[in-house]
A protein has these predicted regions:
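Short gly/ser-rich loop at a beta-strand->alpha-helix junction or flexible surface loop bordering the NTP-binding
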Residues: 1-187
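Surface segments flanking catalytic/ligand-binding clefts of nucleic-acid enzymes
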Residues: 168-303
Length: 303
């Protein structure tokens, strides 16, 4: 559900094992795994789904390695799952045994090994040691930047933006690191990644918020600040009141409310208090559960 509010002018003023912790430190230097993994931004069921997918892929890779059938470097959806980041493609490919398909990348076609069920090999001639993260268990995973790039063949530009912002939200990479990678590497879909990077912004709290911003942009509505802090009001604990998206010049604020805003009692109460504070400020508030869908029906997209 989305909330659209126009404000009056303002003054200008689970895995918990040591292996998982070591893996996350190796991947992106996160020391406080439990406090910095980005899962606090998702509703419980979504966070649980991400963690389960991560655990599943890890278990499959361990089993393949024990049978000496794991080779190359984890890439694409497998690398996304291992990093604990939401996968915008919602890939659910599984083997006949019901386990996730594992994607690996090798440098040349000669490095492919045939006849291993459940393993899909891709070739990237530019693969080098600097692109690989080594885990304590000996499972090699593409670093976040080439992982993002590897999805260019299957994701749309908007989905690449969602993936990049999710990686940034989880502390896996930065926009600057993605730009450096694009500048120094060649791969299929590079142009698509360059277009996506132009749209990437930091501060998004969820993939749905990214989707909302991109939806507005597709109608020519640009210039929205992400995570805008509303001046003059704050929560009882002193925390700032923010809006998912805002245009400070036009005094327009927009928020995306996921289902947990309805089902989580504490979140619901915070939302009610927040809306009342905005109304006290002479704000005008309207709510619609299908706001994006309605825009798609009644407003032509900009070319």
């Amino acid at each position: 559900m989305c909330i659209f509010c126009v404000l009056r002018p303002q003054p200008r003023c689970s895995w918990t094992s040591n292996r998982r912790k070591q893996y996350l430190r190796t991947m992106n230097g996160i020391n406080d795994v439990n406090g910095s993994n980005g899962q606090q931004h998702y509703k419980p069921l979504e966070a649980q789904s991400i963690a389960q997918r991560q655990q599943e892929v890890w278990n499959v890779c361990r089993a393949l390695k024990d049978r000496n059938e794991l080779y190359g470097v984890l890439t694409r959806n497998s690398a996304i799952a291992m990093s604990g980041v939401p996968d915008p493609s919602m890939d659910s490919a599984r083997t006949a045994d019901g386990v996730p398909v594992v994607h690996v990348v090798v440098q040349t076609a000669r490095n492919r090994r045939k006849g291993i069920p459940g393993v899909v090999a891709h070739v990237w001639k530019g693969l080098s040691e600097e692109h690989i993260c080594h885990t304590q268990d000996g499972i090699d995973v593409l670093a976040p930047e080439p992982t993002w790039a590897s999805m260019a063949e299957t994701l749309s530009v908007d989905m690449l933006v969602e993936l990049a912002e999710s990686q940034m939200r989880h502390g896996r990479t930065t926009k600057e690191k993605l730009a450096v990678f694009l500048e120094g590497n060649s791969f299929r879909g590079r142009r698509k990644c360059q277009l996506a990077l132009l749209l990437v912004e930091s501060g998004s709290d969820s993939p749905k918020e990214t989707e909302l911003r991109l939806c507005l942009l597709s109608y020519g509505l640009s210039g929205f600040a992400v995570g805008y802090v509303v001046s003059g009001i704050s929560f009882e604990n002193g925390a700032a009141v923010t809006l998912d998206l805002a245009d400070p010049e036009l005094k327009i604020g927009i928020e995306y409310d996921g289902d947990h805003h309805r089902t989580d009692k504490m979140q619901w109460r915070r939302d009610v208090w927040k809306r009342r504070q905005l109304e006290v400020w002479d704000g005008r508030l309207s709510r619609s559960p299908n706001w994006i869908c309605r825009m798609n029906r009644i407003v032509p997209r900009s070319p």
